[in-house]
Amino acid sequence: MQVILLDKVANLGSLGDQVNVKAGYARNFLVPQGKAVPATKKNVEFFEARRAELEAKLADVLAAAEARAEKINALGSVTIASKAGDEGKLFGSIGTRDIADAVTAAGVDVAKSEVRLPNGVLRTTGEHEVDFQVHSEVFAKLTVNVVAE
């Protein structure tokens, strides 16, 4: 099925690309999420008329994401207190929600879906590097200090 992409899609293309995808992928994911429209003659003409507007909108979203990433990088570090044993092992763990709440409390709005923990949840005290994917192309890093209560 031929579709016109309205947004950048990983491993597929970027704004304005006409790509051939399986019908189920287009029907169940791309079209409902607003990432693509079927490549009919009417939609192609409509898209070409709105191309500049859509590109400007994407540029604004990217600029806003870069600004948020700069704010996250400017924070430097965030401290989270949690109950821990004598050897520095936490009772429980610190996950994406806890980190997102701590960063939001520090003054930068972050959704838990933007927090990336490549090594899984934090289970020990100390400093941990945490990645944030604010946009599909924009990443930020932050140090999370986990201290015992």
Swiss-Prot record:
SUPFAM superfamilies: L9 N-domain-like, Ribosomal protein L9 C-domain. It comes from the Bacteria. The keyword Repeat does not apply. GO terms for biological process: translation. GO terms for cellular component: ribonucleoprotein complex; ribosome. It holds the Pfam family Ribosomal_L9_N. InterPro entries: Ribosomal_bL9 (IPR000244), Ribosomal_bL9/RNase_H1_N (IPR009027), Ribosomal_bL9_bac/chp (IPR020594), Ribosomal_bL9_C (IPR020069), Ribosomal_bL9_C_sf (IPR036791), Ribosomal_bL9_N (IPR020070), Ribosomal_bL9_N_sf (IPR036935). Keywords: Ribonucleoprotein, Ribosomal protein, RNA-binding, rRNA-binding. GO terms for molecular function: rRNA binding; structural constituent of ribosome. Binds to the 23S rRNA. Belongs to the bacterial ribosomal protein bL9 family. This is Large ribosomal subunit protein bL9. It comes from Cronobacter sakazakii (strain ATCC BAA-894). The lineage of its organism: Bacteria, Pseudomonadati, Pseudomonadota, Gammaproteobacteria, Enterobacterales. The gene is rplI.
